[in-house]
Amino acid sequence: MAEPQVLSKTDRRKLDSSPDDAFYESPRYVTHADDGFIDRLTKLYEATVPASGRAFDAMSSWVSHLPATDYRWVVGHGLNKAELEENDRLDEWFVQDLNADQNLPLADGAFDAVLCALSVQYLQYPGAVFSEFGRVLDDDGVLVVSFTNRMFPTKAVRAWRTASMAGREDLVRSYVDAAGGFESTRVVRDQPESDPFRAVVARRRR
């Protein structure tokens, strides 16, 4: 897949350039934001992901932060097999390093929602990945990309590490714009507890 140029070579650099799959080889059964952030994210999912819909939880882990809604199908993706096996919200999952291979093994228009929580800061080729998010979304499907100020700093790209929270909003919006085919992009901002809550929400239009 051709990479829409969003980040320069300098901007996509990481302090730790070793393979990501080695960094994530050991499972981490922790959450990467406080309870207030997670509660706000679950409420946003409840408001945006259609009930009985099909959801793709990209860059997931042992927990998806989805509400108790009975979705038709939930597919997860991540870098640690043990964590994904532990996630009881996933009907299906796969392991793939998106910095090595941006092509998702998923059908066109297969999902009503694509979710990416607390992980976008690690993408070195976000234009290509977001293009894939758009490809697997059905028409009028929703993309929800959430983040806070926490990260593994050695694995976050330079553009993210050096940006303010407002700058990070702009980065994610630029990823959506580079992918093409999205509209009605909005940013949800909140401060439920200590961790600031941000989410970029966009709709797929073919």
Q: Which residue stretches match the model-derived regions?
A:
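Core SAM-dependent methyltransferase catalytic element
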Residues: 180-181, 189-206
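A short acidic, Gly/Pro-enriched loop at the edge of an enzyme's catalytic core
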Residues: 101-114
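A short glycine-rich, Lys/Arg-flanked "PGG" loop and its adjoining helix->strand segment in the class I
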Residues: 127-142
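Conserved class I S-adenosyl-L-methionine
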Residues: 142-174
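Class I SAM-dependent methyltransferase Rossmann-like catalytic core
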Residues: 2-50
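Class I SAM-dependent methyltransferase SAM/SAH-binding core
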Residues: 43, 47-104
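A short SAM/SAH-binding and catalytic strip from SAM-dependent methyltransferases
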Residues: 112-127
